């Protein structure tokens, strides 16, 4: 990963974290890794655990970012979520939501909960 892409990714994750906090989420973990899988942000609100992918777009204003969630991405997120839950037994009885926080320099944050 290029240094520029890493900086943009970190910036996007900070913006997304602030956004999630503003709508009542508590951030539990950022950049959680399990085997070869990663979840950008894990948060909780009420009795729901949110596993969120963050996408930072500079262009593609008409692009629907939900299409980035192909089968392979869903599989990796599920695997990482299972790993997180196996390490955090007290959270296993919570509902789970897989989400996307899309950040566009022109549109701001768009939040897509319950993608799959």
UniProtKB/Swiss-Prot annotation:
Belongs to the UPF0102 family. NCBIfam families: PRK12497.4-3. SUPFAM superfamilies: Restriction endonuclease-like. It comes from Leptospira borgpetersenii serovar Hardjo-bovis (strain JB197). This is UPF0102 protein LBJ_1427. InterPro entries: Restrct_endonuc-II-like, tRNA_endonuc-like_dom_sf, UPF0102_YraN-like. One of its GO terms (molecular function) is nucleic acid binding.
